[in-house]
């Protein structure tokens, strides 16, 4: 009698946090390019090497989200509340775009409808 063995291979995605970190790294290193002859991409800054298939590139710069833009409907960031200690997108350093910010302390009293 014969015997047979079965092998199964599968591919699996990396953990979500790792994928996000890699994508953020690519975003931070993205290079501006323009369309050259024969539909080839070349870097806008000639000091850089031509992009590879693994590089993230862009043709147009992003709008300035700090400033109000009625054409695109962007409200800008002036007047918004920020988180003073945060290093993230909601943090004052990033959200206030170098304009500075006012700090204030607020106390709120609300009924909690607690039952004991």
From Swiss-Prot:
GO terms for biological process: canonical Wnt signaling pathway; cell fate commitment; neuron differentiation. InterPro entries: Wnt, Wnt_C. Disulfide bonds join 82-97. Keywords: Developmental protein, Disulfide bond, Extracellular matrix, Glycoprotein, Lipoprotein, Secreted, Wnt signaling pathway. A lipid is attached at residue 1 (O-palmitoleoyl serine). It is found in: Secreted, Extracellular space, Extracellular matrix. Glycans are attached at residue 69. GO terms for cellular component: extracellular space. It comes from the Eukaryota. GO terms for molecular function: cytokine activity; frizzled binding. Palmitoleoylation is required for efficient binding to frizzled receptors. Depalmitoleoylation leads to Wnt signaling pathway inhibition. Belongs to the Wnt family. PANTHER family: PROTEIN WNT-5, WNT RELATED. This is Protein Wnt-5(I). It comes from Eptatretus stoutii (Pacific hagfish). The gene is WNT-5(I).
């Amino acid at each position: 009698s014969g015997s047979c063995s079965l092998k199964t291979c599968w591919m699996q995605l990396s953990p979500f946090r790792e994928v996000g970190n890699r994508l953020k790294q690519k975003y931070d290193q993205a290079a501006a390019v323009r369309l050259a002859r024969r539909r080839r991409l070349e870097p806008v800054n000639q000091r850089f090497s031509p992009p590879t298939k693994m590089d993230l590139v862009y043709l147009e710069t992003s709008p300035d989200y700090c400033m109000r833009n009625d054409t695109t409907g962007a409200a800008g960031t002036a007047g918004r509340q920020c988180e003073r200690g945060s290093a993230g997108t909601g943090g004052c350093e990033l959200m206030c775009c170098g304009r500075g910010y006012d700090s204030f302390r607020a106390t709120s009293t609300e009924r909690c409808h607690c039952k004991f």
